[in-house]
Structure formats: structure tokens, C-alpha cells
Amino acid sequence: GNNPLKTLSPRFSLAYHINQKIDLTASIGTYYKIPTYTTLGYKDANDDLVNKSMKYIQSTHYVLGTQFLPNEGFRITTEGFYKEYNNYPVSASTGVSLANQGTNFGSIGSEEINSTGKGETYGFEIFVQQKLIKKIFYVVSYTFVRSKFSGDNGILIPSSWDNKHLISATLGCKFKKSFEIGLKYRFAGGSPYTPYD
């Protein structure tokens, strides 16, 4: 809407420098995101925009982390996080959250929607970075994450992107004359599914 007080987004962060090699960090913040244009632009048989009164999706993030710098070119960070979602879009016809409708290439949100869903995401991340040393650099990260959203029934169930395990690795080598070659690897755990007999 046009009232900025309804989407006021306070954010706070702290960093505590234990010594030259170790930092502790903490942050909390509220964020708002406009629903997708597919949802906002949906019209019924009378050519009326049925979702024009949807609320912004609200999320509040809580993060605690550490940073370890054993030497100038090497860094390890760890982070634990929890995110809480409100006003998440839910299908008016099925009562299912849009976050639980699959990750295929179909059009999601082109229907009447309510802003009644809730959700949560939580987990931790470990990030390791080696800056350029003897022509070689690398970055490796591992994230464990759980993602759950509710529809009209209020029961949190795994979302379509509840992959649990995410791994990313980049290895690079720099040569003379600004030439560089690299390899990248990504892994995402399987999507949730309902078993059947």
C-alpha cells in the first residue's frame, strides 16, 4: 500500500571484536516483499484485479555468527539463522501456500490469493574462503536449512525448496595477462515429496 508505516522495516546489527582473528556478529531485521506480479495482475472473468488488496509478505530475520581470520588471505565464517514469515500468499481455492505448490515451470499465483500464510526457515551456514595464494583461490560453503510454510489450516509443512543440504565450491587459478580458469560445483538435497504405496 501507500502507507509507509505499514512496511516499516527496522534492522539492527552488532559486531564484537574479540581479538585480531575472531569477531562475533548478531543481527535482527524486518523485511517486506511485494507479492509476485503474476499474483497481483491476476484478473477474474469480469476483468477485475482480484488480488489488489494483498498485503506485503513480511519476514523477520534473526542471525548469529562468527568470523575467524587466521591469516590475511583465509577466512572462515559460521552463521545460524531463523526467519519468520507472515502474510504469505495462500491459494483461495485450495488453501495451500504458494511456497508448497512445487518448483516446476507452471504459473504459480495466477488465481485468487489470500495473505494468510505463515512460514519459517532456519539453519546454519559454514563458509571458507582462501584468497589468491600461489595463483590458487577457492571458496567452499555448506548450508543446512529447513523451510516450512502453512496454508489455511495453519500447519507448517516442508516447502518446495526445503532441500536441507546445500553445498557450493569454487576453485580458481590465475595466470599471467589477466587469464583465469575456474571450476564450480553445486549440490542441493532433494525436494520434499509425499510417499505413496
Please name every model-derived segment.
Residues 1-19, 34, 153:
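Signature of Gram-negative outer-membrane beta-barrel scaffolds
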Residues 8-14, 50, 60-64, 76, ...:
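Hydrophobic, lipid-facing positions within transmembrane beta-strands of outer-membrane proteins
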Residues 82-84, 105-195:
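Gram-negative outer-membrane beta-barrel transporters
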Residues 6, 16-17, 30, 56, ...:
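Residue-level signature of outer-membrane beta-barrel architecture
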